[in-house]
């Protein structure tokens, strides 16, 4: 099956539109699971395909957990695993993994401080924050996120105490949720304003199950929620996730992988609305690889982002924020060595 996917992707070949524009990719995963491997060699095959990707940020995916010890401390194994991968990336000459976003159960409340301190120690200067995904929908056709969250997790008092602890300790929160839940993040951002937060993947605009072929109705829900969220200055947005099949745009059903023109045409309105709502200084283009590899290649994805920027007429300074600057500021990523 992997060979079929590789052949499907390889059928669409593009050169970078701008091979010099610096990119800090603020969202990718790494894993070594029975179903597949995506480690530094695979990451560098993608980031080194033509665009100028200098640094990256790893985001949790339940990889490398400890298999023994207290349950709440086991996710620290992922930080240790990625720290080792980061060292390999620094030695191998490609994009350097320069920050780590891990998992901790924020419903531990104030007691999550122990887990955060352990992540920070394990990261050896790379740990930046936590993603505790809350993506949930009442439809049995929509699979919830890997954390198996209950509905309305962001309103849980214990969760909010853990979320506040993140900010108090100087760490950030990555929010992964569906479009129907973004309003819950608005409430959380209002109630606990001191924790920096980045909303992943354009706010999760679903396009399958009960949301299939209802894109305008989904927009009518998510866009006002994004506009309300943008009023909270501690909130930033990741612009990406657009290759995921749950968004229902049908890339996987094409006879060959889409071109950057196709990807840009499919997503330009939504991406430009997000950027215009938050401003380029609070938006960052992300790959979400290898998950988004189900939809297009890395080069096609970043060509699509560059096409959208060209179409919108963003200035050099605005583009610098979108492709690198916002990610550097939010995740406190210094310049490459």
Model-derived features: where do they sit?
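Alpha-helical scaffold segments that flank or form the walls of functional sites
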Residues: 33-95
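Structural preference for beta-strand elements that scaffold enzyme active sites
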Residues: 22-25, 55-58, 94-101, 125-131, ...
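Catalytic pocket-lining loop regions of alpha/beta-barrel enzymes
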Residues: 149-284
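Mid-to-C-terminal alpha-helical segments outside catalytic/metal-binding sites
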Residues: 1-22, 26, 38-46, 54-55, ...
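Active-site gating/metal-coordination segments in enzymes
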Residues: 2-8, 72-181, 187-190, 203, ...
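Short loop/turn segments at strand-loop or loop-helix junctions that form parts
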Residues: 57-64, 131-136, 199-202, 239-243
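Active-site metal-binding loops of divalent metal-dependent hydrolases
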Residues: 28, 134, 202, 288-289
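Histidine-centered catalytic micro-motifs
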Residues: 21-33, 199-202
